[in-house]
A protein has these predicted regions:
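Transmembrane beta-strand segments of Gram-negative outer membrane beta-barrel proteins
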Residues: 19-21
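Flexible, acidic glycine-rich loops studded with aromatic residues
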Residues: 261
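Bacterial Sec-dependent N-terminal signal peptides
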Residues: 1-12
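Contiguous, structured surface segment used for ligand recognition
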Residues: 10-17, 26
């Protein structure tokens, strides 16, 4: 009888909240045991069933070892995370921030450090001391979505990461993209920013679909920051919001806000 009630309660919860998700940065290898304990003791009892892990380049890539960042999880480390998630019926989804968030403050991210030719705004220099606002409107750097060799690199690391996590989905980030369609970019300059954003979403989506995987993204670039009053972080001030009508309809859009959910 108790088992029947438990199953009924779980079924009702699944119907009301089919995705009960949590997003967190990747642990350092030294903190892996604590991370596993967190899954077992905090996420599982709260009935979390989806875990997005922001890996970025903190993985020991074999396809592109040059992209492995300062602290990096091994395949064996990832297997422990996957095992803990399976045990607790949690779907685990790895994330690498694509398009935007290729830098933070005065530090360039791993992709553009290794492949500076991918930079959308190479003429804008990183400040010694970062401050916002600034004359360059530099929040975070972006890669150029039209650079010829870009996706060959991205697809290799995405596939390797998803394989390691045994995941049927990938979170591409794509939030807070300020630099897109930069006037001085020989490939993107003068192009419609919404079309560029939609084109990059579609390119990544189509690759994932070929691999049998679902694409997840953050939703802020698909909201009009001016009409909604949400501002330029939680929504778009550079007209990418029109991409909502141009992107595939079978991807998952994660709506986030600083003060509202």
């Amino acid at each position: 009888m108790l088992f029947s009630i438990s199953v009924l309660a779980q079924t009702k919860l699944d119907s009301l909240l089919p995705v009960r998700g949590f997003c967190i940065d990747a642990p350092r290898p030294a903190g892996l045991d604590s991370f596993i304990h967190f899954i077992d003791s905090e996420l599982a009892p709260r009935k979390v069933n989806t875990l997005v892990v922001q890996i970025e380049y903190h993985f020991q890539f074999q396809t592109h070892p040059e992209l492995t960042d300062s602290f990096a999880l091994s395949k064996a480390d990832v297997r422990k995370i996957v095992s803990a998630c399976k045990k607790n019926n949690i779907r685990v989804i790895p994330q690498i921030n694509l398009l935007g968030h290729q830098s933070w403050a005065n530090r360039t991210g791993k992709l553009l450090k290794v492949y500076p030719q991918f930079d959308e705004t190479p003429d804008i220099k990183m400040p010694v001391i970062y401050a916002w606002p600034n004359s360059d409107n530099l929040y975070c750097r972006s890669y150029c979505p039209l650079y010829p060799e870009l996706h060959q690199v991205l697809f290799a690391v995405i596939d390797e990461l998803c394989d390691a996590f045994e995941s049927n989905a990938f979170h591409a980030g794509m939030d807070e993209v300020f630099f897109i369609g930069y006037d001085k970019c020989p490939r993107c300059g003068g192009r419609d920013k919404a079309e560029l954003f939609a084109g990059e979403v579609t390119t990544i989506h189509d690759h994932l679909v070929l691999k049998g995987r679902e694409m997840w993204i953050w939703g802020d670039r698909l909201l009009d920051g001016k009409t909604t009053g949400l501002g330029e972080w939680e929504a778009s001030f550079n007209n990418t919001y029109r991409a909502i009508d141009m992107i595939p309809k079978d991807l998952v859009i994660c709506d986030w806000h600083y003060d509202r959910a």
